């Protein structure tokens, strides 16, 4: 992670200096892995400037960052060799691990309390290197329905490789833990009991509404439009103030009407 951070910071500064509006969102893990491989080749003892393929490197970075091909190859060379030197120094500092307790042991004998204090620390360091709990926790985060025993068996089948363990669980090669499932099913309440409990506690039943009879309200009839004057003349001369006048209907419309009155009974003599 420290090496990737160094690469990301140096490339970000280099691009911001030479490309004003550079889109740095493409600097992902794949890009950093490619640049790391190129820098490892440059940092090797057998490599030289003639062996390095600058054109392919520029084409690759042009695909990630538009405008990279406009930067001169000399500046790119200087940046790459400087960055490879920084990475080699960072690797050297990581590989060298100081051990002050050994130097003190030559000068003064360690007390038993110091021994007991250093022993758990050494054990913790050894445990951090190969700690299966971290892999189990990651598997449980990825697969919440997976049990601890299933995650442990998947890690043991994958020999500690997390990606293989994930693939094993996805393929269903891990046998389900029937004992734990049966215990959970025995302790879990039934679905019908849960439904009754929820309905009894939270449902509001309006019993009075069931007793009422529904009587729909009759639609309101529009009042008839009464007319008093037509063409500035009184409609009726019988003393009515207003009168309802029906619109004249055509003969075709009258033919469509049906007479529902019973026919007259004629008596024949």
From Swiss-Prot:
Main localisation: cytoplasm
UniProt superkingdom: Eukaryota
Alphabetical list of CDD domains matching this protein: CUE_CUED2 (cd14367)
CUE domain location: 131-174
Location in or out of the cell: Cytoplasm; Nucleus
This protein's GO CC annotations: cytoplasm; nucleus
Coiled coil: none
Family, as annotated: Belongs to the CUEDC2 family.
Function: May play a role in targeting proteins for ubiquitination and subsequent proteasomal degradation.
Protein name per Swiss-Prot or TrEMBL: CUE domain-containing protein 2-B
Organism of this sequence: Xenopus laevis (African clawed frog)
Organismal lineage: Eukaryota, Metazoa, Chordata, Craniata, Vertebrata
């Amino acid at each position: 992670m420290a090496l990737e951070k160094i690469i990301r910071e140096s490339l970000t500064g280099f691009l911001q200096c030479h490309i004003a509006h550079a889109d740095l969102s493409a600097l992902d893990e794949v890009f950093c892995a490619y640049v790391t491989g190129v820098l490892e080749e440059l940092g090797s003892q057998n490599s030289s400037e003639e062996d390095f393929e600058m054109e392919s490197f520029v084409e690759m970075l042009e695909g990630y960052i538009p405008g990279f091909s406009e930067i001169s190859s000399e500046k790119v060379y200087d940046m790459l060799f400087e960055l490879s030197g920084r990475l080699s120094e960072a690797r050297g500092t990581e590989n060298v691990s100081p051990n002050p307790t050994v130097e003190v042991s030559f000068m003064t004998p360690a007390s038993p309390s110091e021994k007991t204090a250093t022993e758990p620390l050494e054990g913790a360091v050894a445990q951090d290197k190969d700690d299966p709990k971290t892999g189990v926790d990651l598997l449980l985060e990825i697969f919440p329905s997976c049990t601890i025993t299933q995650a442990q068996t998947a890690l043991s089948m994958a020999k500690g490789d997390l990606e293989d363990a994930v693939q094993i669980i996805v393929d269903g090669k891990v046998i389900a833990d029937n004992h734990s499932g049966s215990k959970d099913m025995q302790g879990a309440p039934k679905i019908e009991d849960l439904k009754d409990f929820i309905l009894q506690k939270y449902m509001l039943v309006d019993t009075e509404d069931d007793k009422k009879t529904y009587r729909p309200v009759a639609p309101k009839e529009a009042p008839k439009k009464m007319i008093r004057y037509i063409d500035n003349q009184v409609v009726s001369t019988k003393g009515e103030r207003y009168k309802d006048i029906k619109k004249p209907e055509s003969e075709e419309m009258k033919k469509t009407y049906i007479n529902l009155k019973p026919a007259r009974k004629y008596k024949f003599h």
